[in-house]
UniProtKB/Swiss-Prot annotation:
SUPFAM superfamilies: L30e-like
Pfam families named in the record: eRF1_3 (PF03465)
Any single GO BP term: RNA surveillance
Gene3D superfamilies, A to Z: 3.30.1330.30
Name this polypeptide is given: Putative pelota-like protein YCL001W-B
Disulfide bridge positions per record: none
UniProt family annotation: Belongs to the eukaryotic release factor 1 family. Pelota subfamily. Highly divergent.
């Protein structure tokens, strides 16, 4: 998480935040590590939930590391509320 926040603050194009940006990175097979919150996997909108599951599958198929983060963690709450 610290590496992600560091790259995000440097704006060095090594970290993406948000669904659209992350999907673009996935299309380029540019995801080495995927951090995703458990809340997106619990959405009532089945199409959106399936989209995130596809993103996880794509990242895993390209040897990416996948971490599902609990939204109950304070750092995840801060990240979710961050204005970027």
């Amino acid at each position: 998480m610290d590496d992600f926040l560091e790259h995000l603050s440097k704006d060095d194009n090594k970290a993406w935040y948000g669904a659209e940006e992350t999907e673009r990175a996935a299309k380029l097979d540019a995801i080495e590590t995927l951090l995703i919150t458990d809340s997106v996997l619990k959405r009532n909108d089945v199409k959106k939930r399936e989209k995130y599951l596809d993103l996880i599958e794509n990242s895993g198929n390209n040897n990416g590391k996948i971490f599902v983060l609990s939204t109950s963690k304070i750092t995840v709450s801060n990240l979710t509320n961050q204005q970027i």
